[in-house]
Amino acid sequence: MSHPALTQLRALRYFKEIPALDPQLLDWLLLEDSMTKRFEQQGKTVSVTMIREGFVEQNEIPEELPLLPKESRYWLREILLCADGEPWLAGRTVVPVSTLSGPELALQKLGKTPLGRYLFTSSTLTRDFIEIGRDAGLWGRRSRLRLSGKPLLLTELFLPASPLY
């Protein structure tokens, strides 16, 4: 099963450099902290609608593959992050199978828990980069994060109801 927001997320085109944008827009797009937490700061109840979760092969992650180690399988999680039931963000997380060891095995068991609630409680979290993307008037971003030095790629598309707009 897919969702139109995830199709648009995969269509994001990324800027080579951080574009000169309104400071409020950049504040959202370059946020280093948890987007879940930022949404909750808007006074909203945040929930996850699961679209897809499971192992995939390289041919299912062509956009992410150049940014991750080449492996036989990857854990893919596609969700809508909702605020008071309204979708504000589409998220796609790709995790190499080699990342799924030790405490990071929990990435497979998040269920309806927002990824940010797990990631931003880890003292081993680092971020390699944030890239800003755009498609058809919507903004997004992708980040390569590391847990205990092990990579994962998170792509987020801000949906029209999001306070980013």
Swiss-Prot record:
Assembly notes: Monomer.
Principal localisation: cytoplasm
Native species: Escherichia coli O139:H28 (strain E24377A / ETEC)
Spans traversing the lipid bilayer: none
Protein family per UniProt: Belongs to the UbiC family.
Protein location: Cytoplasm
Catalytic activity: chorismate = 4-hydroxybenzoate + pyruvate
EC numbers on record: 4.1.3.40
Classification lineage: Bacteria, Pseudomonadati, Pseudomonadota, Gammaproteobacteria, Enterobacterales
Pathways per UniProt: Cofactor biosynthesis; ubiquinone biosynthesis
Gene Ontology CC annotation, any one: cytosol
UniProt xrefs under Pfam families: Chor_lyase
Keyword annotations of the record: Cytoplasm, Lyase, Pyruvate, Ubiquinone biosynthesis
GO molecular function: chorismate lyase activity
Protein's name according to its UniProt entry: Chorismate pyruvate-lyase
Listed GO biological process terms: pyruvate biosynthetic process; ubiquinone biosynthetic process
